[in-house]
Design a protein with these regions (language model features):
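Oxidoreductase cofactor-interface core, primarily capturing Rossmann-like NAD(P)-dependent enzymes
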Residues: 1-27, 31-38, 52-55, 62, ...
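Short, conserved active-site loop motifs that form the nucleotide-linked donor/cofactor pocket
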Residues: 43-44, 138
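Cofactor-binding loops of NAD(P)H-dependent oxidoreductases
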Residues: 49
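Aromatic/hydrophobic pocket-lining residues that form the small-molecule binding cavity
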Residues: 84, 88
Length: 299
């Protein structure tokens, strides 16, 4: 039995689907049974639980051989790091109680740092807590910058006529599709090779900048003149709050961006076959961004 946290999300859905396709028994954990229905209809066992509830998670993990764990985002929380720490505490306690032997945990570039990285601090804390479970083999997948983070640009292009972000336009980022993270996690669960605690970075197909993003998106949507605007952090924070994010979460995201711009958050591994994933940004734009952009334009 395999257990997947965040199964209705971008990475967890892929993990669960890959495991099912390999004819494995899969238990999926989510906050809402309706969100789990697409996977339940394919044969997974649903388990509705609050991820801050260690007792409930221990029941969900009971009898399982391996688990995929992550901290589901909660962008409206007034205390995002406090929330992520409660999730980490619950996951660690539940894994230990259930005696799970093999664990794959979603983390991030920059998780080696204990402060100054915005929400990534929560992933640092998750790693520290899972490191204390002596009985479990844990693989931390430290992923790069999600390509999905650029989906919000569809609205920016429609409203402002440009791509806008506080990220430096020339900053090369290891952008990765979340589907590739899910595939890597599923493979690690199906073919466990971790002894003790290990870290593996996932750096996408190549490093690209927001200047590259603008060029690729502009070509794909028929706007080759599309420009990039670097937005000041304070202005960006206000935009995020307008969109429904808590002020604290918006502040943390600006802190993360500042750390990226300063070179504080970066890959520790040299790019190699093991940390390079197949989906390039051009494919992501064609298959994910352009449909989202057109759907917004038609709304």
């Amino acid at each position: 039995m395999y257990v997947v946290i965040g199964a209705s999300g971008n990475t967890g859905h892929v993990v669960a689907t890959k495991l099912l396709n390999d004819n494995k028994k899969v238990r999926v954990i989510g906050r809402n049974s309706a969100h789990l229905q697409p996977l339940t209809s394919k044969g997974t066992e649903p388990f509705v639980a609050d991820v801050t509830d260690a007792s409930a998670l221990a029941k969900a993990f009971h009898g399982a051989d391996a688990a995929y764990v992550m901290i589901p985002p909660n962008i409206t929380s007034p205390d995002p790091l406090g929330h992520s720490n409660r999730v980490s505490d619950a996951i660690a306690a539940a894994l230990q109680k259930a005696g799970i032997r093999n664990v794959v945990a979603l983390s991030s570039n920059g998780a080696e740092l204990s402060s100054g990285t915005g929400p990534i601090v929560g992933l640092h804390n998750l790693e520290q807590k899972l490191n204390q479970i002596s009985s479990a083999n844990v693989l931390f997948l430290r992923a790069g910058y999600f390509m999905e983070n650029t989906l919000g640009q569809a609205n920016a292009i429609r409203q402002m006529g440009s791509v806008a972000s506080p990220v430096r336009p020339d900053l090369k980022l290891p952008m990765i599709a979340t589907s590739d993270i899910g595939t890597a996690a599923a493979d690690a669960l199906l073919h466990p090779a971790t002894q003790g605690k290990q870290t593996r970075e996932l750096l996408g197909q190549r490093d690209i900048s927001y200047n590259d993003v603008v060029t690729i998106i502009g070509k794909a949507i028929g706007k080759p003149e599309l420009k990039y605007v670097q937005v000041p952090g304070d202005q960006f924070r206000g935009i995020l709050v307008q969109m429904g994010m808590s002020g604290t979460m918006a502040k943390l995201l600006v802190e993360m961006t500042d750390a990226m711009n300063a070179g504080k958050i970066h890959a520790l591994e040299h790019r190699a076959a093991q940390n390079t994933t197949p989906t390039d940004y051009e494919t992501f734009v064609a298959e994910v961004f352009v449909p989202a952009y057109r759907q917004q334009a038609a709304a």
